[in-house]
Amino acid sequence: MQRKYFFTSPPLKMPELPEVEEAMLRLRAAVEGRTIARVRTHHASHQRQLPAAAARRLRQQKIVRVERRGKHQLLHLENGSTLHAHFRMNGDWMMSRTDQPLEKFTRASIDLTDGTRIELHDSRALSSMKLHGKGENPLPKLGMEANDESLDADYLRDALSKRKGPIKPALMDQAVIAGLGNIYAAEALWRAKINPRAVSSSISRARLVKLAEAIHSVLDNETRAPGRYTDTENRDRFQVYDREGMACSRCGSKIRRIPQGGRSTYFCPICQRS
């Protein structure tokens, strides 16, 4: 069997809702209804997250359901426990066979009884894999899914009404909107013509209507055309992200980059004045 990433090689950078959704769907097709032979961890941080004793409890467990919540992937097992995975900055799944050697950056691996192996591949070792017992909630507090049709101006107004900080980091807070990250938050703000430094609670309802529409539009486009973003690929598919110094497609001004919350924010200083 030829080893293959679920996305691209090298792995995608900064997976957000569309990428994690596709990863979950491919993972579901590969493992749902199948039985785990063993789970191993191959990096110190992952060994702390999933100790050997916990990994042993996964043996001969049938994977009954795979789902996504925000950027989290959940493998629900026959005994009621849940294996919880998160890609963080640049994780990816890789499919191989149990008789093949592990890749250099494989941080955890799931061997199935049919000989299939799913590897959690992550060059920066920031990804995670944890086991949660029956009845335990594996998830942190999460807001509404970014692709939920109910996400509208009223939801955004309520979620942002007490926030005095800038809108861009607020949109990336998973307790506000689950699944939205740095790339698509920047793209949605550009479409809605909202300055990323605008105070969250001060944005008018009319702008929030535009913002909700922009979030749905950006994610719909990415879901329909899921080419994966890396440092050197697919830059032209974005309007502002990673386009510092390039011309805004709407007004021709140069895209700017500013630091916000330890991340780079890209925006048009003319289109996004408000």
Where are these predicted regions, by residue range?
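Structured catalytic/nucleic-acid-binding cores of DNA maintenance enzymes
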Residues: 2-274
